[in-house]
Regions:
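Helix-turn-helix repeat elements of alpha-solenoid scaffolds
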Residues: 85-100, 128-139, 168-180, 209-220, ...
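Structural register within alpha-helical repeat arrays
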Residues: 120-121, 158-162, 202, 242
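A short, Lys/Arg-rich alpha-helix, primarily the initiator
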Residues: 1-14
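Charged, helix-prone or intrinsically disordered regulatory segments positioned adjacent to compact structured domains
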Residues: 57-136
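Short alpha-helical DNA-recognition segment
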Residues: 16-34
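Amphipathic alpha-helical segments of tetratricopeptide repeats
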Residues: 97-104, 139-146, 179-187, 219-231, ...
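DNA major-groove recognition helix of helix-turn-helix/homeodomain DNA-binding modules
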Residues: 45-60
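Residue register of alpha-helical TPR repeats
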Residues: 113-116, 153, 157, 197, ...
Length: 303
């Protein structure tokens, strides 16, 4: 199926609908028949009504039209949305390569250009620890979007991945805007996992600024949302960060318990990337005490 008419016919027959049912409130049956036979194209408002009659989104229609195969752009966005931590450098590099291939054919695609730049910025921050150069790489994105009266879903997807590259004040401002926008999209997209990640990552800034009590506040919010909605991976990451904060606050035994719990849960879930990320973060924040902590993901814990 490579055209609109054949795809409409395939969907209609698959749903056991008559042509009259398919075109209800959209156009006459005779005109609908011409669309299925690829003789005319429907106007956008009538096409939308036909899709409503099919209980189908435009995105799904295009997916079916391509024989249930994602387009190169959709594949990039799928991989981009699955990135959990900035430490997944192999995945970041792979998606950058796919962006480069796509942009050779579609050089004016602003969104994919933003995705590519955001991933390059993340790599500079993660591998080279060069936040200045990373900010230079992505600054144009925020410069453009900061002037927008509304942030849309693709804007959210990019900004949630790069806000940590900016200076603290700018980063916190970006997160606040993203949280507001996420609430608007909660009935259309799965926003809670993103909200959890934003709170956990903003806590990182606060830890670096030694604002431990405020960091703990956002971490507790993350843990609550994660537990209520069964986001176990995000739960692990938030619990680990809670342990770090408690340790910084002088509650060393309690902090160790939470860090040990995060490591153990990640191990049980067989999430090796998350386990490695948690270890790296503990080592980064508590490097001087790492031997004294004697953490081990194999240690049994009381959940």
């Amino acid at each position: 199926m490579q055209n609109v008419g054949d795809t409409l016919k395939f969907i209609r027959k698959s749903k056991s609908l008559t042509q009259k049912e398919a075109c209800s409130e959209a156009l006459s049956r005779s005109n609908y028949q011409k669309i299925e036979n690829n003789k005319i194209m429907p106007s956008i408002d009538r096409f939308i009504q036909i899709l409503l009659n099919f209980n189908m989104t435009l995105e799904e229609f295009e997916f079916v039209k391509r024989d249930f195969t994602p387009s190169p752009k959709e594949n990039i966005l799928y991989l981009y949305s699955k990135i959990l931590t900035s430490s997944e450098t192999d995945i970041l590099t792979d998606v950058i390569s796919k962006c480069e291939d796509y942009l050779k054919e579609h050089p004016t695609d602003i969104f994919i250009s933003d995705v590519k730049a955001s991933l390059e910025g993340i790599l500079l921050a993660e591998k080279e620890h060069d936040f200045k150069l990373a900010r230079e790489k992505v600054a144009y994105i925020w410069e453009r979007l900061s002037k927008s009266g509304e942030l849309f879903w693709n804007d959210i997807m990019v900004l949630r991945n790069i806000f940590f590259i900016f200076e603290n004040e700018t980063a916190q401002h970006i997160v606040n805007r993203l949280i507001v926008q996420l609430k608007k999209y909660r009935y259309l997209y799965p926003t809670l996992s993103i909200e959890i990640s934003l709170h956990v990552n903003r806590a990182t800034y606060l830890i670096l600024d030694e604002k431990y009590e405020l960091a703990l506040y956002f971490i507790e919010k993350s843990i609550k949302i994660a537990k209520q909605n069964h986001y176990y991976i995000q739960f692990c990451m938030a619990v680990a960060k809670k342990g770090i904060v408690l340790y910084k606050l002088g509650e060393k035994e309690a902090g160790k318990v939470f860090m040990q719990r995060a490591l153990r849960v990640a191990k049980v879930l067989e999430e090796e990337r998350i386990l490695s990320g948690i270890k790296d973060e503990i080592n980064y924040f508590l490097h001087d005490d790492i031997e004294q902590l004697s953490l081990n993901e194999a240690t049994k814990i009381n959940l």
